[in-house]
């Protein structure tokens, strides 16, 4: 192992010496091209997809509404491949709180929408921005409202016939809401 480290160190020194020699001792001032030939400027439409924010009080939520029954269909089509048929199985993050935590197949308590997230509006915001994984930001507001309703219902937070919209979503009280506190430190090292 020591020989490998020594060889690596000698190689780095040699590369640095060559680079410095070629540039007259100015290795860190190489002139790079203005563009590396990849990427492009984002369009206004692409920027608008990401330029959103939904606050805990619902400010920023779009018009529309969602139903649990419709969300179940959207979930099956666009989410179950990553999160499992019921939101528990995976292979990616678990979304639904386990209804039988004594099941020996269940891992330790995972952070889910039903036991960790502080605000229901965050569910909408996160789905809208980041899902589905293979095409983030592609869901319509209607699909996101439907998915939000379905996931809140599956976590036991709303009834099957509840309608989720900009007025009702902020009123859903999440079980973990009181576990999150605002950071009120002021430019100092103090810790509460």
Label each residue range with its predicted role.
Residues 1-9:
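Sec-dependent N-terminal signal peptides
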Residues 37-74, 132-136:
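Electrostatic cytochrome c docking/interface patches
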Residues 71, 75-86, 95, 147-151:
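The canonical Cys-X-X-Cys-His
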Residues 8-27:
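Bacterial Sec-dependent signal peptides at the C-terminal "C-region" and cleavage site
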Residues 136-192:
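Flexible coil segments in periplasmic/lumen-exposed cytochrome c-class electron-transfer proteins
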């Amino acid at each position: 192992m020591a020989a490998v480290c020594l060889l690596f160190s000698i190689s780095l020194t040699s590369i640095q010496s060559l680079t410095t020699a070629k540039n007259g001792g100015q290795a860190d001032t190489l002139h790079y091209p203005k563009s590396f030939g990849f990427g492009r400027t984002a369009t206004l439409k692409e920027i608008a997809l990401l330029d959103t924010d939904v606050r805990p009080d619902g400010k920023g939520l779009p018009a529309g509404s969602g139903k649990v029954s419709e969300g179940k269909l959207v979930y099956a089509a666009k989410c179950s491949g990553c999160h499992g048929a019921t939101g528990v199985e995976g292979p990616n993050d678990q979304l639904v709180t386990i209804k039988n935590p004594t099941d020996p197949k269940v891992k330790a308590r995972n952070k889910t929408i039903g036991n960790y997230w502080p605000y229901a509006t965050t569910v909408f915001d996160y789905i809208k921005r980041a899902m589905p994984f293979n095409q983030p930001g592609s869901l319509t507001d209607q699909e996101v409202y439907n998915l939000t309703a379905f996931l809140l219902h599956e976590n036991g937070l709303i009834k099957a016939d509840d309608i989720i919209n900009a007025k009702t979503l902020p009123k859903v009280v999440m079980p973990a809401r009181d576990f999150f506190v605002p950071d009120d430190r002021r430019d100092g090292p103090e810790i509460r």
